[in-house]
Amino acid sequence: MRCPFCGHEDTQVAETRESDEGDVIRRRRRCPSCDKRFTTYERAELAMPAIVKKDGSRSEFDRSKIRASMMLALRKRPVSIDQVEAALGRIEEKMLATAANEVPSAKIGEMVMRELKKLDKVAYVRFASVYRSFEGVDEFSRLIKDI
């Protein structure tokens, strides 16, 4: 790594420590040219794909929006916050596993529906009715028969 003080190309690692959470590595470095010390931090960069909405616009992945939608569907249902967080984690893992730069919002909606179906059937029906814009009882009946 280049020294930030003198620009020397090769610095030496004097000390390495991992953070308590294990997600960051702290390194103390020394420059053999100017003998100054400095600290660097290393962490994995996990870039979530951009979300492509139905109208073609793009936005960043926002975990809080998905959590809010799930919590609305799960209102007054016997599902814990930990279960919701675990489901959100699985959705994020699937997003990262796609290795795509962009993901259609419809795909995320389907992932949310699958997770809600596992957590609570009533919440699944609530979410599906809004997500799929149900307009009649027949659509509810078909969805419930598929469960």
UniProtKB/Swiss-Prot annotation:
Entry superkingdom: Bacteria
Query: Can you give the residue ranges of the ATP-cone domain?
Result: 49-139
* Bound cofactor: record note: Binds 1 zinc ion.
Zinc finger regions typed unnamed: which residues? 3-34
Keyword Signal part of the UniProt annotation: no
Kindly state which keywords UniProt assigns to this record, in alphabetical order. Answer: ATP-binding, DNA-binding, Metal-binding, Nucleotide-binding, Repressor, Transcription, Transcription regulation, Zinc, Zinc-finger
**Which residues, if any, are the signal sequence?**
none
Q: Which cofactor does it need?
A: Zn(2+)
Q: Which Pfam families match?
A: ATP-cone (PF03477), Zn_ribbon_NrdR (PF22811)
Q: Which InterPro entries match?
A: ATP-cone_dom, NrdR-like_N, RNR_NrdR-like
Q: Which GO terms are recorded in the biological process aspect for this UniProt protein?
A: negative regulation of DNA-templated transcription
The record, for PROSITE patterns, names:
ATP_CONE
A Gene Ontology molecular function term of the record = DNA binding
Q: Which family does it belong to?
A: Belongs to the NrdR family.
What is the purpose of this protein? Negatively regulates transcription of bacterial ribonucleotide reductase nrd genes and operons by binding to NrdR-boxes.
Q: Protein name, please? A: Transcriptional repressor NrdR
Origin organism is: Methylibium petroleiphilum (strain ATCC BAA-1232 / LMG 22953 / PM1)
* Gene name tied to this protein: nrdR
